[in-house]
Amino acid sequence: MFMILRNVGKKLSRLEQMNVNSKNTVLESLIEKSDDKELVKNRFNRLLNSFVIPPVSIDPKGIIVKLEHILNTQEDNMKDEIQLMTKDLDDVEISILMNLVEVSLGINLMYKYIRHFYISGKKTGNMMIIAQIQMILPQIMEQAEAYNAAIPSLKSKKPIGDGIGPLVASKLSGESESKEVVRDTILNEITIENRNAFIIKAKGPGGNVGKPGEAIKKVVEDKKDISLIITIDAALKLEGEDTGEVAEGIGAAIGGPGIERYKIEEIATNNKIKYLAIVTKMSEKEAITEMKTEIEKSAEILLTKVKETIKQHSKDNQNIIIAGIGNTLGVK
């Protein structure tokens, strides 16, 4: 037991170090944009200790609507806090600071949970608690290291791996006119392979993910005759798979809490619309850090796959939707 405790203790020390570093880095970024250092410190500490209570799931009916409302409230609250702490920032700067705060919140939460079980195990002498921590620690540490590496990437404002979907959507849209159809989400109308294509992505170049599900729902309801929906996104690779590998599948390629995917599935099912997915494989760390060359190069393969899919699964003059899913940091 002593050896296990020592091993867990070392990992906990590393987590604590990452937690302190992330807090200091994000705090410095906020202070740089503010005139009131003490205000920033106090408000930032409040944010770090904030929490979200999920809706009751005993009766699952309507839980998606409740969850969406809670998450929208959380996002609005964080945006208000950032605006309160800083001065005269545009939407791009605010979204990047929000991303940085969210990363710091994630590392802080991981550290506090591991610390809790470590202390509980030592206090009670319960070997099972310590053994369980040891089993999950490799995954926790991998995720924490990924979050820690994301901070300089976010500060640099360069595209991250998760931005591959918006990057492809941007390449497809070219110089066509875009309009914001729902919150932080834009739509471009183009012609591709003799089809009328509606290109959807989050609004860049800030660190937004938008509401692609809501945007797709709106387009389908407005047009009524959509024949195909294609989602393009980053996907978590399995060990042994190559970064930048492209794969095709059925369904909606979109992560997160499930709200946007639910909307895509619901509208596609109700209207009998075929919905397909094309993804680029990458690790969690590669998804939230500066976009690797292998991932960037996969954009051309994705473009080819999109055109092939359009030809195979739709006909001339039909209306289709192509959604680039992911974080638009550094992608216009």
Label the predicted regions.
Residues 1-6:
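N-terminal signal-anchor transmembrane alpha helix of single-pass membrane proteins
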Residues 297-303:
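Terminal transmembrane helical module of multi-pass membrane proteins
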Residues 319-324:
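Short hydrophobic beta-strand segments
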Residues 292-295:
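Active-site pocket-shaping loop/turn-to-helix segments
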Residues 116-290, 301, 308-315, 326-332:
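Conserved mixed alpha/beta catalytic, RNA-binding, or beta-rich assembly cores of soluble enzyme
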